């Protein structure tokens, strides 16, 4: 039986990635109503993901899934962090600001973090998972795929930026991919226990 899962985002890129991660499940993903805005007031990725999932679930009366993710740059004391999406108006502005702030800094170590949360229709958080991908910030963008900071986030083990990776490769190594890999077994267990 297919269950509706409201995705607490208006970001079409995130929706497509989530649909790919959950393709072989009994969940049908749909975007949240555009007029439903949830302000990200949390100071951690986990608190923001839980807040968004809970608010959207309560407002729609459906199960809801949310993620909060961002880039933490070691030399910038973890910034942009939870402010990653608000570091500029466009992807280009965000990348430019980050590269300007890093300047000629030698330590380019960084990590992408993703926390995914699922809330039941009453707003209670049913599941939560985290994924982390370590990498480095390049001095200039490379690649045309992906979105956000993907063109400047380089994964040394793969010798590619996120923007140079195929969707399949990115899915297997990214912070979001790792979070969903941790979440899927929990979702399957939850569905089987609720079916009993």
From Swiss-Prot:
One of its GO terms (biological process) is purine nucleoside triphosphate catabolic process. The keyword Magnesium applies. Binds 1 Mg(2+) ion per subunit. Keywords: Hydrolase, Magnesium, Metal-binding, Nucleotide metabolism, Nucleotide-binding. GO terms for molecular function: dITP diphosphatase activity; ITP diphosphatase activity; metal ion binding; nucleotide binding; ribonucleoside triphosphate phosphatase activity; XTP diphosphatase activity. Mg(2+) binds at residues 39, 68. The active site is at 68 (proton acceptor). It is an enzyme of class 3 (hydrolase). The keyword Nucleotide-binding applies. Gene3D superfamilies: 3.90.950.10. Substrate binds at residues 9-14, 69, 147-150, 170, 175-176. Its cofactor is Mg(2+). GO terms for cellular component: cytosol. HAMAP family: Non_canon_purine_NTPase. Pyrophosphatase that catalyzes the hydrolysis of nucleoside triphosphates to their monophosphate derivatives, with a high preference for the non-canonical purine nucleotides XTP (xanthosine triphosphate), dITP (deoxyinosine triphosphate) and ITP. Seems to function as a house-cleaning enzyme that removes non-canonical purine nucleotides from the nucleotide pool, thus preventing their incorporation into DNA/RNA and avoiding chromosomal lesions. NCBIfam families: RdgB/HAM1 family non-canonical purine NTP pyrophosphatase. Belongs to the HAM1 NTPase family. Homodimer. This is dITP/XTP pyrophosphatase. It comes from Nostoc sp. (strain PCC 7120 / SAG 25.82 / UTEX 2576). The lineage of its organism: Bacteria, Bacillati, Cyanobacteriota, Cyanophyceae, Nostocales.
């Amino acid at each position: 039986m297919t269950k509706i899962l409201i995705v607490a985002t208006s970001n079409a890129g995130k929706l497509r990635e989530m649909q790919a991660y959950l393709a072989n499940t009994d969940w049908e993903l749909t975007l949240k109503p555009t007029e439903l805005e949830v302000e990200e007031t949390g100071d951690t990725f986990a608190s923001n993901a839980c807040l968004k999932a809970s608010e959207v679930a309560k407002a729609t009366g459906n199960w809801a899934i949310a993620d909060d993710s961002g880039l933490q740059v070691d030399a910038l004391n973890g910034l942009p962090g939870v402010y990653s999406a608000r570091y500029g108006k466009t992807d280009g502005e965000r990348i430019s600001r980050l590269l300007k702030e890093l300047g000629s800094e030698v330590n380019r170590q960084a990590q992408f973090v993703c926390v995914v949360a699922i809330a039941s229709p009453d707003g209670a958080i049913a599941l939560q998972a985290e994924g982390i991908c370590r990498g480095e910030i390049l001095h200039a963008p490379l690649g045309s795929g992906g979105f956000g900071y993907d063109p400047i986030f380089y994964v040394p083990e793969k010798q590619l930026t996120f923007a140079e990776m195929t969707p399949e490769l990115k899915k297997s190594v990214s912070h979001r991919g790792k979070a969903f890999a941790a979440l899927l077994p929990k979702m399957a267990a939850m569905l089987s226990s609720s079916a009993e």
